[in-house]
């Protein structure tokens, strides 16, 4: 753990000493300027309003960013499953032999992981229902739940309860608030600009089901083991006052983005070739004028030249998908309900 704190100190010093570059090199390097970071943040907030720009305390402001756009934040992002639980499920899936003799791959293991998450959610719902029912034990609560004789809902109108809000308030007042599933955690997520790597940088601050801040070791439980000792650092969030966070080191972000851009460009070019072959084939069948199809090639180049290319303002949306692989139990999809 001492090594992580030393790395944090070195990282902070490097951020302070690195000069700011305003020259755009995104398409060549995958890096972005502060201005491009702001544009990407505006796009993220527009598409997914659960993310918001935030100012920083006066002493923490960075003069190369607008005062009201110092960092991005989304709060109360749920996490029901620890990273180790995901990894255990994935290993089990890889070991299972299918009927035709081949072994499940990482891609195929997504389904059981999602099921595991749904199981945890159902557990959370049952836990709350049983606790609020006044059951003295989970077993008693489950028996009450199963024996309640609730009828099947056949009409959407049956889901509407005009007194539900009042009932919830009354229950909360009588019980001192809803009791949460002890396995559930919530995270506040922050994205700021890294001057040393010229890419976004993610910070996470976690809380348990009672709202108590998680320790660094507890937050590490939500980091995939492959990244835990390589790309994750414990440090004080430099844009907040005395807040311990876990940061995801941005050293590979630019390279990942560059690879993704190459793949997107290759896919766009392959699609263009397929489309051209299709037009040519149709022309040979007499359903189109082959000469006109050839003449339209230049027009297609103008209109489709940027098709499939990742735009710089889309950076943070892609960035979050990369970060999700580092913290598989944190439900980033929750922050993208507006999509």
UniProtKB/Swiss-Prot annotation:
One Gene Ontology cellular component annotation held by this UniProt entry: phagophore assembly site
Domain of life: Eukaryota
Alphabetical list of InterPro entries matching this protein: Atg3/Atg10
Sorted UniProt keywords: Autophagy, Cytoplasm, Protein transport, Transport, Ubl conjugation pathway
GO molecular-function term, one example from the UniProt record: Atg8-family ligase activity
BP term (GO), one: nucleophagy
Active site: 251 (glycyl thioester intermediate)
Primary localization: cytoplasm
Localization per Swiss-Prot or TrEMBL: Cytoplasm
Transmembrane feature ranges: none
Keyword rRNA-binding attached: no
Handle region: annotated span: 255-314
Region of interest: Flexible region: 86-182
Assembly, per entry: Monomer. Interacts with ATG8 through an intermediate thioester bond through the C-terminal Gly of ATG8. Also interacts with the 40 amino acid C-terminal region of the E1-like ATG7 enzyme. Also interacts with the ATG12-ATG5 conjugate.
Domain remark text: The N-terminal region is involved in phosphatidylethanolamine-binding and is required for ATG8-PE conjugation.
Family per record: Belongs to the ATG3 family.
Protein task: E2 conjugating enzyme required for the cytoplasm to vacuole transport (Cvt) and autophagy. Required for selective autophagic degradation of the nucleus (nucleophagy) as well as for mitophagy which contributes to regulate mitochondrial quantity and quality by eliminating the mitochondria to a basal level to fulfill cellular energy requirements and preventing excess ROS production. Responsible for the E2-like covalent binding of phosphatidylethanolamine to the C-terminal Gly of ATG8.
UniProt protein name: Autophagy-related protein 3
Origin species: Pichia angusta
Lineage, highest ranks first: Eukaryota, Fungi, Dikarya, Ascomycota, Saccharomycotina
Gene from which the chain derives: ATG3
